[in-house]
């Protein structure tokens, strides 16, 4: 029993969090209400949809070294296709519902989905040279100067697809859930990756696509979320 309890502490560690009323009354995420019996039919519908997704994630199963936290979104001829790759801001949806309800399952799902999307569904390599000057200042400067340049697409996300690492697209990356994981989970990696995506949006490398439609609203949303978190 002691061993089982100790393993549970590792697999499902305790989390400090506030009650739903505190999150909703703070207005940090705008106007939203905690779960209430006053709108029972609405709440049942919300619970059904979230539980349906969790059921399918377990049943299929949708988890593994590269897919843990994600799920598929297209059902055709009795089979599921296309990993969601966080489209559109699914981890943020789970964080919001956790704040409304305080449900541990929603917290764990949001946590896993944010960590998956920020590291699997985003572009991290190859990065450009970075001059540090923390060992041999002169040598570091020349090595950084001569190093090959990195990819201009670091920070770009990927759209839904049959593989996790295909279909790179500028209009398919959402930082709101990653920053929520930084606030609610204390996960600094979320803010770190969000900054990389913010840098990408500032470069505005959209290929043949202009700054219109989703690229426009995502640029604004992602950068506003980052500004709120960093004031930079």
What are these regions (language model features)?
Residues 1-232:
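Catalytic cores of extracellular degradative/oxidative enzymes
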């Amino acid at each position: 029993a002691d061993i089982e309890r100790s393993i549970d502490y590792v697999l499902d560690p305790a989390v400090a969090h506030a009650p739903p009323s505190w999150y909703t009354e703070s207005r940090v995420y705008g106007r939203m209400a905690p779960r209430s019996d006053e709108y029972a039919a609405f709440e049942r519908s919300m619970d059904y949809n979230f539980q349906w997704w969790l059921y399918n994630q377990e049943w299929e199963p949708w988890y593994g070294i590269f897919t843990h936290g994600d799920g598929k979104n297209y059902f055709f001829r009795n089979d599921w296709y296309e990993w969601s790759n966080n489209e559109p801001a699914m981890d943020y949806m789970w964080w919001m519902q956790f704040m409304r309800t305080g449900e541990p399952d929603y917290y764990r799902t949001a946590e896993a989905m944010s960590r998956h999307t920020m590291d699997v569904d985003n572009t991290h390599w190859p990065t450009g040279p970075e001059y540090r000057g923390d060992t041999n200042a002169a040598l570091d400067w020349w090595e950084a100067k001569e190093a090959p340049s990195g990819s201009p697409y670091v920070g770009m996300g990927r759209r839904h697809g049959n593989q996790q690492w295909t279909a790179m697209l500028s209009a398919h990356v959402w930082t709101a859930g990653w920053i929520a994981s930084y606030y609610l989970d204390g996960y600094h990696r979320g803010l770190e990756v969000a900054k990389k995506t913010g840098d990408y949006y500032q470069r505005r490398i959209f290929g043949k696509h202009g700054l219109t439609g989703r690229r426009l609203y995502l640029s604004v949303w992602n950068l506003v979320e980052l500004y709120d978190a960093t004031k930079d």
